[in-house]
Regions:
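Sequence-level preference for short, compositionally simple segments enriched
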Residues: 1, 288, 297-298
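C-terminal functional modules
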Residues: 1-26, 30
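Conserved beta-strand/loop scaffold segments within soluble protein domains that form the structured core
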Residues: 25-28, 33-294, 304-309
C-alpha cells in the first residue's frame, strides 16, 4: 500500500502523482507495489532467478512513457535489482526511473540497481533518474545507492540520460558505460549534491565505436560541508567520432572534489575534448544578490539552484 511518505518520495524522484496511464512498475521494500503494461510496452518479472524486471518496447513505439521508480521505507533493508530494457527500432520513448529512501531507524538501507539497455536502430530514448534520501527525525541510518548502467546504442539512435542526486544519500558509487555504434549519439547530464560527510564516486565510460558516433557529458556538482566527490569520465574514440566532456564543480566548507576526465583516441579521425573546473562561489555574485535583499544563505541557495538546474 502506498502511504503519504511513499507518495512524497514518488513525487520527488519521478514527478509521479496518482496512477498514470503509461507503463508502470513501482518497487517498494523489495516487493512489487504496482505494475501495468501497455499495448506497446511490456513489463515482466525476470525468469533467471534474479530480482528485477524486463522491459520490452515494441518497434515503432512513439510518445509513450515508462515509470520504474524504487522506494524504500524501512531501515536495514538491502537489495540488488537487475532491470533489462529491450527497445526496438524507430522508437521515441521516455523512461523515468529513480530511487527514494525514507530510513526509519539506525541501520543502513541500500539499493544497488543494475540496468542494461539494448537500443535498436534509429530510436530516441530519454532516461531520467533521480536519487533522494531522508531519515525520520533523530534517526541516523545510512542511505546508500550504487547504480550500474550499461547502454548499447544501435546505429542512428540517440540516448539522453539525465541523472540527479538531490540530497540525503550518504554513499554512492556509480558506474555507467555506453557503447555507441555508427551515427548514434549519447548526451549525459549529471547533477550531484553532497553535504555532511557524504561520499560520491562516479565512473563513466563512453565508447564511440562507429563513424559519426557522438558523445557528450555535462557534469555539474556541489560539495558542501565535509563531503567528498570523485568523478572519472572516460571517452574512447575508435572511429571518425566526436566526444566532449565538461565537468564543473562548486566546492564549499571543508569539502573535497577530484575530477579526472580522460580521453583516448584509437583513430586519427577521432575528435575528443575534455574540460574540468572546480571553484568556489564568486563573492561578487553573492554581493549582487545580497544588495537585492537576500541574506547570505539565501543568496548561496539561489546560486546553487541555478548552477544545478
Amino acid at each position: 500500500m502506498i502511504d503519504r511518505i511513499d507518495s512524497e518520495l514518488l513525487q520527488k524522484i519521478a514527478d509521479l502523482t496518482g496512477k498514470p496511464v503509461d507503463a508502470l512498475n513501482i518497487r517498494k521494500d523489495s516487493g512489487c507495489e504496482a505494475r501495468q503494461s501497455t499495448e506497446h510496452i511490456e513489463i515482466t518479472s525476470r525468469t533467471d532467478g534474479k530480482e528485477g524486471i524486463d522491459i520490452r518496447i515494441k518497434p515503432g513505439t512513439k510518445g509513450e512513457k515508462c515509470y520504474i521508480p524504487v522506494i524504500i521505507s524501512k531501515t536495514g533493508l538491502s537489495e540488488m535489482v537487475y532491470n533489462d530494457f529491450y527497445i526496438g527500432d524507430d522508437c521515441d520513448v521516455d523512461i523515468i526511473a529513480g530511487c527514494g529512501i525514507h530510513n526509519t531507524g539506525c541501520d543502513e538501507s541500500r539499493h544497488d540497481g543494475v540496468h542494461t539497455f539494448h537500443i535498436g536502430r534509429n530510436s530516441r530514448v530519454h532516461y531520467a533518474e533521480k536519487h533522494y534520501g531522508e531519515n525520520d527525525p533523530g534517526q541516523t541510518g545510512k542511505n546508500v545507492m550504487n547504480p550500474q548502467t550499461v547502454v548499447y546504442i544501435g546505429e542512428g539512435s540517440t540516448m539522453q540520460m539525465d541523472t540527479v542526486q538531490i540530497r540525503g544519500i550518504d554513499s554512492t558509487k556509480r558506474y555507467t558505460k555506453f557503447v555507441c555504434e555508427a551515427g548514434s549519439e549519447v548526451v549525459v547530464t549529471e547533477r550531484l549534491l553532497t553535504h555532511g560527510k557524504q561520499e560520491a564516486v562516479s565512473d563513466m565510460v563512453i565508447e564511440l565505436g562507429g563513424d559519426g558516433a557522438r558523445g557528450r557529458v555535462i557534469s555539474r556538482s556541489v560539495a558542501q560541508d565535509d563531503s567528498y566527490q570523485e568523478f572519472r569520465p572516460v571517452v574512447v574514440g575508435n572511429a571518425a567520432c566526436f566526444g566532449h566532456v565538461q565537468c564543473d564543480s562548486i566546492i564549499m566548507g571543508n569539502a573535497k572534489i577530484s575530477s579526472v576526465p580522460a580521453i583516448t583516441a584509437n583513430s586519427t579521425e577521432a575528435e575528443l575534448i575534455h574540460e574540468a573546473a572546480i571553484g568556489k562561489i564568486a563573492g561578487d555574485q553573492l554581493l549582487k544578490l545580497e544588495t537585492l535583499g537576500l541574506t547570505h544563505e539565501e543568496a548561496e541557495d539561489t546560486i546553487l539552484k541555478g548552477f544545478l538546474a
